[in-house]
């Protein structure tokens, strides 16, 4: 790779961030954007937390403005991020998707499709203190039942005050450093309707005795579950906090409570009992405040200390509490790398999950004696995409060329639902899955983008086709 001049860097960087320097609003889960941001982040070009989604567009712009690229390949990625943000936040955006069937393996960050065929039209408008994203979706061959062929999934409205974004709508979330899944808050299900609050910019505290925590973010959300028959109108209340005391380390803590609903206590006192961990204080445990999950995650980057663009990450989420700490834990761990090849970028990871309790106990994770439909909405998990009691090992490598073509190969080995739990409709039968998935995406005309995928899955009981293919198109339109 060839060093580029300071003048070229300055001019190129100014061009790359010019349209985003004054951007405001939220950015929903997007795999292409995350991979490019992670490539820069893990190489020390930018500093940005990527474990809590939606992201704030102001924080992305702030990170890009402070970017320190040294190679032409890094400048290419900066420009690509700018282009992707412009596409995602275009005034109008038309998206279409079609497939032969659903993939036979669990899908990772930003990859969930709720139907075999869909057409979406989105309208975006934002200013210094507001952000509106209105989206209508028409679906056919639904994978996740919704009671209607038309829905507003992905829509939201948000206002900003004192560096805080407060939003309402149906927004997907993601809590944790994993690519294949999050043990506590993933996007494998349809988004719930609710409110969400988070910081716009993740600056470190100005108070001297808190400055050591470094850049930090929080997210507080309260949503109502859809079509949850066990306890209709059940609520999901969650909070997450991340801190970065060193450039090489990010720590996160997450907690969620499944609470209230039809026929359930919903007083502030009952909520407070749950919030303070008094889950079993009543003689009649039918008054137990709710179903809770909590835990921690981390990401350790080697670039700041060793100069290697490689990072380790992990997540631990418990179904119970013991000694003020999570217990009956599920685990996730992985390693990722981000390299340059000329002006092309290479991203890869290897990741493992175990959603059994303490890596052995079954029929416990994502279940509850009151909320008997479990930690699932419409049968699809709010946490890990394979649901409870599963084990997964997956690896993926992606090549991104200078002209923004993405070529990827993903390998998956998973054991899912060994007890045939009826609440898990994503994988309703005990099965061993061995799959390969190939992907290509590229710009076919100006900013019109085509996404394609081809997969094969070896399984015993899946109702999905062993071999399948999909295609998607994105058409951003600006006034």
Q: Which residues does each PLM region occupy?
A:
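Signature for the C-terminal beta-barrel architecture of outer-membrane proteins
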Residues: 194-372, 388-389, 393-395, 400, ...
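Gram-negative bacterial Sec-dependent N-terminal signal peptides
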Residues: 1-21
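Short loop/turn motifs that connect adjacent beta-strands in outer-membrane beta-barrel proteins
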Residues: 26, 49-51, 71, 79-91, ...
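Transmembrane beta-strands of outer-membrane beta-barrel pores
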Residues: 98-102, 127-129, 138-142, 161-163, ...
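Outer-membrane beta-barrel "beta-signal"
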Residues: 241, 465-479
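Surface-exposed loop and membrane-interface regions of Gram-negative outer-membrane beta-barrel proteins
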Residues: 113, 130-159, 176-188, 322-325
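N-terminal periplasmic/intermembrane-space "pro-region" immediately following the signal or transit peptide
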Residues: 11, 22-111
């Amino acid at each position: 790779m060839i060093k580029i001049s300071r003048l070229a860097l300055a001019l190129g960087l100014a061009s790359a961030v010019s349209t985003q320097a004054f951007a405001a609003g939220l950015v929903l889960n997007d795999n292409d954007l995350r991979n490019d941001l992670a490539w820069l982040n893990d190489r020390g070009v930018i500093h940005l937390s990527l474990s809590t989604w939606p992201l704030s567009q102001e924080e992305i712009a702030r990170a890009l403005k402070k970017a320190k690229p040294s190679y032409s390949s890094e400048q290419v990625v900066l420009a690509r991020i700018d282009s992707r943000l412009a596409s995602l936040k275009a005034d109008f955006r038309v998206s279409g998707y079609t497939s032969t069937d659903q993939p036979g393996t669990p899908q990772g960050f930003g990859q969930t499709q709720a139907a075999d065929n869909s057409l979406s039209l989105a309208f975006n408008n934002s200013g210094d203190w507001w952000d509106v994203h209105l989206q209508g979706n028409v679906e056919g061959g639904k994978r996740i039942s919704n009671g209607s062929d038309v829905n507003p999934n992905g829509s939201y409205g948000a206002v900003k005050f004192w560096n805080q974004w407060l939003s309402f709508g149906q927004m997907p979330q993601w809590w944790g450093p994993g690519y294949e899944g999050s043990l506590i808050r993933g996007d494998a299900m349809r988004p719930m309707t609710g409110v969400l609050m988070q910081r716009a910019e993740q600056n470190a505290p100005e108070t001297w005795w808190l400055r050591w925590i470094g850049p930090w973010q929080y997210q507080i959300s309260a949503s109502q579950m859809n079509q949850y028959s066990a306890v209709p109108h059940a609520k999901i209340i969650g909070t997450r906090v991340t801190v970065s005391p060193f450039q090489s380390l990010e720590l996160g803590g997450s907690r969620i409570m499944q609470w209230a609903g039809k026929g359930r206590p919903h007083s502030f006192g009952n909520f407070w009992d749950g919030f303070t961990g008094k889950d079993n204080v009543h003689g009649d445990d039918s008054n137990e405040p709710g179903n809770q999950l909590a835990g921690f995650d981390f990401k350790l980057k080697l670039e700041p200390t060793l100069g290697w663009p490689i990072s380790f990450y992990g997540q631990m989420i418990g179904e119970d509490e013991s000694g003020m700490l999570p217990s009956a834990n599920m685990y996730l761990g992985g390693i990722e790398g981000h390299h340059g090849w000329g002006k092309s970028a290479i991203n890869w990871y290897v990741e493992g999950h175990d959603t059994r309790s303490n890596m052995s106990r079954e029929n416990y994770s994502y279940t509850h004696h009151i909320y008997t439909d479990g930690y699932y909405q419409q049968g699809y998990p709010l946490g890990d995409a394979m649901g409870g009691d599963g084990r997964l090992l997956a690896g993926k490598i992606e090549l991104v060329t200078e002209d923004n073509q993405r070529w990827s190969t993903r390998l998956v080995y998973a054991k899912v639902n060994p007890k045939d739990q009826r609440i898990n409709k994503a994988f309703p039968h005990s099965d061993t899955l061995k799959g390969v998935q190939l992907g290509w995406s590229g710009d076919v005309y100006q900013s019109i983008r085509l996404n394609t995928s081809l997969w094969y899955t070896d399984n015993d009981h899946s109702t999905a086709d062993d071999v399948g293919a999909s295609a998607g198109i994105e058409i951003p339109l600006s006034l």
